[in-house]
Curated annotation (Swiss-Prot):
PANTHER family: CST COMPLEX SUBUNIT CTC1. GO terms for molecular function: DNA binding. It comes from Arabidopsis thaliana (Mouse-ear cress). This is CST complex subunit CTC1. Belongs to the CTC1 family. GO terms for biological process: telomere maintenance.
Length: 1272
């Protein structure tokens, strides 16, 4: 130790960094740690703490160091929140410490610390973990004790000189357990004042021998008698960390006195320490090791050894091994600073509670007053020390009164609230409901009374442990896991990645990842997988918001998820946290091989909320998720807080409101062209009614609502008889009363309702005195405005009048066709009308419930009773006013409501909604030479059967989709650029949707989406299987051919051909051919929108030209999309014999398809144009030019792969092509569309457009030729 540096405590504290040091950099001294015989838990291993690479190891000093000092008992001079931990002092400064290999002789002796960890702390400067140490001077070992085998609990300076005759009892045995230090009120012997004395209890399994002596040790001891010893007083309580080290070992105490105490009415004999008490260190018998019981298996208690993976909520929740959690919730527990992430701890007398939650099974280690924890190895990581909180909150008191499963659940809820940046913005709520209070309020509303556990004092629970109910924990718990959205989304991604990894191990890549083109041909949501909330056992927490793309999302601080058409009450608030207990999770676009596999093989875990698992697989599937929920599925957490619902009712005090009805919504459209921004405003067409609602809600009514939502059935709902104008019935229709009294029912999401009186006042012109007519206006919103999403076509709404209100009819000069800018902060309420005594919707044409409370996600099953619709405000009007309001409420049916299906009773009912499915009479127009579709606007509702990425004569080349909708057993086709409708979350097969204002094409059952068309998703079938493919030829390896039985917008399916083919002579021909060359190839990314990136590759081929030969003639065949995919053979697996290519692709992934690896290149360069200047490909590829739009150059491997792609197409099979001829106008159109020079004039080749492509099966072709000969 000549070159060893001596550090002082002051040096470490002043430096203020976490470091570790040792006396030797090459070898470590022998440790004094005890040779504990208990084995480590099989699940625990040192590598468990190294799995998280984000943890940082303690910084080691690069030179040998030692520290000299003295280990002392706790004292009041060192203010430590943990109160009872060892002290280490070098004479100048004192800090907290813990020591491995503890020996009695170390107390008060000077030691040399050979290896150590130091962690800075705010309260006392720092904490020293002593790993290896040795005595400095063995001659001073007897300075404190009279003998090597005895240590007086109180120094001789304070102890009585005369021995007390009552202090003659002794106890020897095995120390089973130790309680925390607590305070007991006692009477002062000098005065009559009450003083609080600290102390702690120990439980010893003692021997029946009368007197303890060293000479009697060698006789056999039988430790069979249960004895309790109370260490009383400040000096005795300071021995708590020493006695904690002795749990499970032999000890002896002498100089005790006996006291008879009463616990729950029963007497109990307890030994109490005195001023003369002496503690004798552990000993070993000369006849062998004394048998001892380290693991107590009586009841549900035992011992557990494991590594600490994480500490949460200031050490109340400790993560041990997988699905093993230690609860340290009792405020009085004395915990060591050294219980840190990465340390190995040994827990004794802990409750084992195997609990089965709805989301999975968890082993809970419940600590009680008998639990003791010792650290066997210190953590090597730079993690924070465990510091007890001196403040006892109402949440901590509440948690202590619960059973262990309920404690764990409550702590997880508390951690979930950490995912939110801020609590509710209302100042009153912010003051009264912080995160602890919010957790307590939420837990009280969810935890049943059976999970509350009455608590006794520390004496009761320690001495009468078996009778305190600690061993009667329920094994089944119905509390669902509460998760924020970020944790939920992350876990679903991990779950999918693990499932994909398993598939790749079990099957070959070609079986599960190489899909034929028919698998990929659908638009979005081809293969949906649905998980119910009952399957996951998870309740979601989040805030509602409208994203910039127009989607409604549930979000928290770090993540979000799309929400599928929820019908929410208008009192939603973006700043309030919502609870979603009932929902459907829709996972879309996954491979068919994954659909029938168990998605919940790895259930949700507590660690999913606390410490999400990092994604194990990169470059994997990108699948969109969405939630489907309804009114009853989204509630505010503060719904029981009085301020929450009173604030809603206060809005209706002494104010008047405008009434309007939504007639149409214009969709949020993405531009669809790179470099051009999306729309900055969205619009809603509305009809402003010439009535104002005047409310008279009083303070008393707002403070005390009449009833709650569960009491709102028609039988028990309270009624107030409305004032009915007796002369109203006799008046003519043109004689409109100035005011109509009505009854108003106000509802909010907090389940509270309020019934009050109100008045409808009509708006009359000043000069004539006649009533105003309804005004049709255009409401302008920003896309992020939540009001846009909440407004439903056909719904009536209330808006409160304001000082700068431009919505007033007759007051601010509003007129027809005015555009009104809607402010985002404007509050709206949905409104429904009912007449006479009917308050709920009974199916009448005159009652208009405008916001449905039923779930948006409808599962097809029989005998499902749908809940009645519900709105924010209901107006009960006199029956005489029914005819008056029908003018305003029913005059829009001809414009926006679809025509009924006559008397045909074969209406399908694939969802639980009570709305009747309608169909529109398509316009029957004569053929026209116009390039644009001609027809009437229609509105209808039906079931989406399929969405095909095909081309049409009425839409552009690259973004056309055909929506097949089943309406009254008739197939209706709708064409249009569906991807531009950014709000269509969850749209696809199995969706029931209503299509508003779509344009007829003049052909039967054929329609087109326009920029004014709006699609509303009503419900979604819960299907876990892919859609049934239409019957196709078994030999086809490409898209199924479009047969006459299917929808064909016109005879020609090619985009360019049909745009200019205005005659019937341009028929398509079929021929078998071989690819000679790839003349032109345009590759680009399909979309920048992540929702478009389904399980297919994100490559778009807007144009491709192939030189083909049918044996007699050579053609220049142009095509796009999936037909080009098929000819290029992108869906086939890469051949293994292509050595260079395979080596290149393995650097990216081991996925087998050509399309996947091409996607890697296109994703980088955005757009690639390949052009061949010759009619055939030369061997050296000298006539091929490749242009990219990105700033990066093609790498050598990328250039080689693209040229190999052309060779792969040339070496392909014989194709059967159905094509139509092209003229120069069509070619020029394609050149302008794709901004390329096709230069077809220099080749004397006929240009054709390939409409259908499929591989020729020789047997099928021979059979068809034979059939043709036979038929001829």
């Amino acid at each position: 130790m000549e070159n060893t540096t001596i550090l002082t405590v002051k040096d470490l504290v002043n430096e203020g960094i976490a470091v570790t040091g040792a006396s030797s950099l090459f070898s470590s001294a022998a440790s004094h740690s005890s040779s504990e015989s208990t084995s480590t838990n099989p699940k625990s291993h040192p590598g468990a703490v190294d799995s998280d690479f984000s943890r940082k190891f303690l910084t080691p000093l690069n030179y040998p160091t030692v520290i000299f000092g003295t280990v002392a008992l706790p004292s009041e001079t060192l203010k430590c929140p943990n109160r009872y931990c060892f002290r280490f002092t070098d004479g100048d400064l004192t800090i907290c410490c813990d020591i491995l290999g503890f020996e009695f002789r170390a107390i008060g002796s000077k030691i040399c610390v050979l290896s150590w960890n130091f962690l800075p702390m705010n309260h006392s400067g720092g904490f020293l973990e002593i790993i290896n140490w040795k005595f400095v001077d063995s001659g001073s070992l007897l300075s404190r004790c009279s003998g090597i085998s005895s240590f007086p609990l109180i120094p001789s300076l304070y102890s009585s000189q005369n021995g007390d005759r009552k202090s003659r009892y002794s106890v020897c045995g095995v120390l089973e357990s130790i309680s925390p230090v607590s305070v007991v009120p006692c009477m002062d012997g000098v005065s009559s004042d009450s003083v609080n004395l600290p102390g702690f209890l120990v439980h010893v399994m003692a021997c029946e021998c009368k007197v303890y002596s060293r000479d009697a040790i060698d006789c056999g001891h039988a430790f069979e008698r249960s004895v309790f010893v109370y260490f009383c007083g400040l000096e005795a309580a300071s021995w708590h960390p020493v006695v904690m080290k002795l749990v499970g070992r032999n000890v002896a105490l002498s100089g005790l006195k006996r006291k008879l105490v009463y616990v729950r009415g029963d007497s109990l004999l307890v030994f109490v320490t005195t001023e003369n008490s002496v503690l004798h260190p552990p000993w070993l018998s000369k006849k062998g090791t004394v048998s001892k019981t380290v693991v107590d298996r009586r009841g549900n208690c035992g011992s557990y050894r494991g590594y600490v993976r994480g500490l949460y909520l200031k050490g109340k929740l400790v993560e041990m091994d997988e699905d093993v959690w230690l609860l340290l919730t009792d405020q009085i527990l004395n915990r060591s600073h050294s219980i840190r992430t990465g340390s190995l701890i040994f827990i004794r007398n802990v409750h084992f509670v195997n609990t089965k939650f709805p989301w999975g099974e968890v082993l809970i280690l419940g600590a009680c007053f008998k639990t003791s924890i010792t650290v066997e190895f210190f953590s090597p990581f730079e993690t924070s020390c465990l510091v007890d909180s001196c403040r006892q909150t109402s949440l901590s008191l509440y948690v202590e009164s619960l059973s262990f499963p309920a404690r764990l659940w409550t702590l997880l809820v508390r951690i979930s609230f950490e995912k939110f940046n801020r609590m509710p913005s209302d100042k009153e709520i912010l003051r009264s409901c912080q995160k602890d209070e919010l957790t307590k309020m939420y837990a009280e509303s969810r935890i049943p009374p059976s999970m509350f556990q009455p608590r006794g004092g520390i004496f009761t629970e320690f001495c009468m442990h078996e009778s305190c109910g600690c061993n009667s924990e329920a094994r089944d718990c119905n509390l669902k896991l509460v998760m924020p959205i970020s944790s939920f989304v992350h876990h679903v991604k991990v779950m999918l990645n693990e499932l994909l990894s398993q598939i790749k191990k079990d099957f070959s890549a070609s079986d599960c990842l190489s899909h034929s083109s028919s698998t990929w041909k659908r638009y979005n949501n081809t293969n949906p997988k649905t998980l119910r909330s009952e399957d996951t056992g998870v309740i979601l927490l989040g805030r509602l918001k409208i994203s910039s793309s127009g989607r409604l999302q549930l979000h928290d601080r770090t993540s979000s998820i799309d929400v599928l058409t929820p019908d929410l009450l208008s009192d939603r608030n973006a700043s309030r946290i919502c609870e979603v207990p009932d929902y459907y999770l829709i996972i879309e676009g996954i491979p068919e091989s994954m659909l029938h596999m168990p998605f919940l093989k790895n259930p949700f875990r507590c660690s999913s909320v606390l410490n999400p698992t990092p994604l194990a697989i990169k470059n994997t599937l990108t699948v969109p998720f969405s939630l489907s929920l309804g009114t009853a599925s989204c509630k505010h957490l503060l719904k029981h807080h009085p301020f929450d619902w009173r604030h809603d009712f206060n809005e209706f005090k002494e104010g008047f409101f405008h009434l309007f009805r939504v007639t149409h919504k214009f969709p949020i459209l993405k531009n669809g062209h790179p470099g051009m921004p999306d729309c900055t405003s969205v619009f809603i067409e509305a009809l402003v009614l010439p009535w104002d609602l005047i409310c008279t809600v009083t303070e008393e009514e707002a403070a005390a609502p009449n009833f709650e939502e569960h009491d709102t059935s028609q039988e028990i709902r309270p009624h107030k008889r409305c004032k009915t104008n007796n002369g109203l019935q006799s008046q003519s229709f043109l004689s409109v009363p100035h005011e109509i009294s009505c009854q108003m029912t106000i509802r909010c999401a907090s389940s509270h309702c309020l019934v009050a009186t109100a008045t409808l006042s009509n708006l009359t012109e000043n000069k004539s005195g006649k009533m105003h007519s309804a005004m049709r206006v255009l409401l302008e919103f920003i896309p992020e405005c939540s009001n846009y999403y909440g407004l439903q076509i056909g719904g009536c709404y209330l808006m409160k009048h304001g000082s700068d209100d431009s919505f007033c009819v007759g007051r601010s000069g509003i007129s027809n066709n005015d555009k009104i800018n809607f402010r985002p902060e404007t509050r709206l309420w949905s409104l429904e009308f009912s007449f006479d005594e009917v308050l709920t919707h009974d199916g009448s044409m005159d009652v208009h419930p405008l916001v449905s409370s039923q779930p948006s996600f409808a599962v097809e099953q029989q005998n499902v009773s749908s809940r009645q619709p519900c709105s924010d405000v209901s107006l009960l009007l006199p029956y005489d006013a029914k005819g008056l309001f029908s003018v305003f409420l029913n005059d829009l049916e001809g414009l926006n409501k679809p025509l009924a299906a006559g008397k045909d009773n074969n209406n399908i009912s694939c969802c639980t909604q009570s709305e009747t499915i309608m169909h529109a009479e398509p316009s029957r127009l004569l053929p026209s030479n116009s390039l644009f579709p001609e027809g009437n606007l229609a509105t209808f509702r039906g079931d989406v059967v399929a969405v095909d990425a095909v081309t049409s004569s009425v839409v552009d080349v690259s973004s056309s989709y055909c929506i097949n909708v089943l309406v009254n057993h008739q197939m209706v086709k709708i064409f249009g650029p569906l991807r531009r409708h950014s709000y269509l979350t969850g749209f696809g097969f199995g969706t029931n949707a209503t299509f508003y204002r779509i344009l007829g094409t003049g052909e039967q059952n054929s329609f087109v989406l326009t920029s004014a068309s709006f699609i509303k998703i009503n419900s979604r079938k819960a299907l876990d299987s892919p859609p049934l493919e239409k019957p196709t030829h078994g030999a086809a390896l490409c898209l199924p051919k479009i047969t006459p039985q299917e929808f064909v917008p016109c005879i020609l399916a090619g985009p360019a051909c049909n745009s200019f083919s205005g005659n019937e002579d341009n028929q398509q021909i079929k021929f078998a051919c071989k690819v000679l060359s790839v003349y032109l190839l345009v590759l680009q990314t399909r979309s920048d929108d992540p929702s478009e990136n389904e399980c297919r590759n994100n490559i778009d081929i807007p144009l491709a030209g192939f030189v083909v030969d049918d044996g007699s003639s050579t053609y220049l065949c142009w095509t796009s999309g999936e037909r080009a995919f098929t000819i290029l053979r992108l869906h086939e697996e890469l051949p293994e014999e292509t050595i260079d290519v395979v080596q290149w692709t393995r650097r990216y992934s081991n996925w087998g398809t050509t399309a996947y690896h091409l996607d890697q290149i296109v994703r980088v360069h955005k757009r690639i144009v390949m052009k061949c200047n010759g009619s055939q490909i030369d061997v050296l590829f000298q006539d091929i030019t490749i242009a990219v739009t990105s700033d990066q150059l093609l790498t050598k491997s990328e250039d080689k792969f693209l040229k190999w792609l052309i060779l792969n197409a040339i070496s392909g099979p014989i194709w059967e092509v159905a094509a139509s001829s092209m003229d120069m106008k069509m070619i020029e159109h394609l050149e302008r569309e794709q901004c390329v020079e096709m230069e077809t004039s220099r080749y004397n080749l006929q240009s054709v457009w390939g409409n259908e492509v499929c591989q020729v099966d020789p047997l099928v072709r021979a059979w068809s030729l034979l059939q043709g000969l036979l038929n001829s």
